Swiss-Prot record:
UniProt GO molecular function: structural constituent of ribosome
Subunit relationships: Part of the 50S ribosomal subunit. Contacts protein L32.
Keywords, sorted A to Z: Ribonucleoprotein, Ribosomal protein
Gene Ontology, cellular component aspect: cytosolic large ribosomal subunit
SUPFAM superfamilies recorded: Prokaryotic ribosomal protein L17 (SSF64263)
Protein's GO biological process: translation
PROSITE patterns tied to this protein: RIBOSOMAL_L17 (PS01167)
Official protein name in the record: Large ribosomal subunit protein bL17
The family this protein is said to belong to: Belongs to the bacterial ribosomal protein bL17 family.
Domain of life: Bacteria
Length: 127
């Protein structure tokens, strides 16, 4: 029975799910906005928010914990050098999920997940 088991299975085994969320977390940290299905975005939020909270206090131990969860040095560097200081005064709620319709092939609900306080892109600044 699955009583009180949190998290979505997403029709994947545990290692596939873990690898997928590692990759998606790295993509979200590097690009600061990604488009994915709504259930994946909601689960990704549970992975990324604790990483940013960890990055608010820069220490070797916290960097090692973040690396153990992401397995990506560039992601860890951006977390601790940019995102940690940016969200230092914010007590949680670092991500925003915006619904964006349905996918053409299978009608799956799609969503953008982005980091709040994301700097505007260069194209938007020029306009």
């Amino acid at each position: 029975m699955r009583h009180r088991k949190s998290g979505r299975q997403l029709n994947r085994n545990s290692s596939h799910r873990q690898a997928m969320f590692r990759n998606m977390a790295s993509s979200l940290v590097s690009h600061e906005i990604i488009k994915t299905t709504l259930p994946k975005a909601k689960e990704l939020r549970r992975v990324v928010e604790p990483l940013i909270t960890l990055a608010k206090e820069d220490s070797v131990a916290n960097r090692r914990l973040a690396f153990a969860r992401t397995r990506n040095i560039e992601t860890v560097a951006k977390l601790f050098n940019e995102l940690g200081p940016r969200f230092a005064q914010r007590a949680g709620g670092y991500t925003r999920i915006l619904k964006c319709g349905f996918r053409a092939g299978d009608n799956a609900p799609m969503a953008y997940i982005e980091l709040v306080d994301r700097p505007e892109t260069a194209a938007a600044v020029e306009e």
